[in-house]
Amino acid sequence: SHSEKGVIELMPTSDGDVYGFKYVNGHPSNTADGLQTVTAFGLLANVANGYPVLLSEMTILTALRTAATSAVVARLLAPKGANVMAMIGNGAQSEFQTLAMKAIVGIDEVRLFDIDPAATTKCAANLAGQGIKVVACDTAEEAIMGAQIVTTCTADKQYATILTDNMVGAGIHINAIGGDCPGKTELAPAILHRAGIFV
């Protein structure tokens, strides 16, 4: 379900013996009310009798899974020896992304940008002492300078273009994780036309 305020998604699966789903939302304006922007929970049920066997909070699991997926993909597809990542969009997921990239890919520098400077300040503070150089940037263009990996994780649903074609050189690995529903585009179409795309 998509609305002007956010998105609610159900992610079901079954192997014939058990049925499970994850419920997750994304509502960027929740912070104005002191609420998390993302919450998730999951249910696992016995297919034979329909009874639930597990109900679990999955907000942290969602953050970990998303970051781990990005890092595993970057390990396989990013240029060998990549050690600098640009992180465009500095909400809570950005910290998980950075730590996963450090652990799995071996990055030693992250360049941060968010349209909300307070988000960048918070992300940088939370990453302090993690053994990674953190550079706060004033623009997306500045953030991607020298980065071999670019991760976008933005919440804009107004067809915003976060990265334009002239910003991204050849050989850059992009994890566009914020473009997950209608209206959340992040990348200029020209980038997609000249890129190898993996979903």
Regions found by a protein language model. Give the residues of each.
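Short helix-loop-beta connector
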Residues: 77-84, 106, 169-170
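Short acidic low-complexity segments
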Residues: 132-147, 163
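N-terminal Rossmann-fold NAD(P) dinucleotide-binding loop
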Residues: 94-95
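N-terminal ligand-binding/catalytic initiation module
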Residues: 1-63, 69-71, 78-81
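Rossmann-fold NAD(P)-binding glycine/threonine-rich loop
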Residues: 167-172, 176-199
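NAD(P)-binding Rossmann-fold cofactor-contacting core
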Residues: 104-128
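Short glycine-/small-residue-rich Rossmann-like dinucleotide-binding loops
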Residues: 148, 154-156, 178-179
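Glycine-rich Rossmann-fold phosphate-binding loop(s) that bind the pyrophosphate
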Residues: 89-91
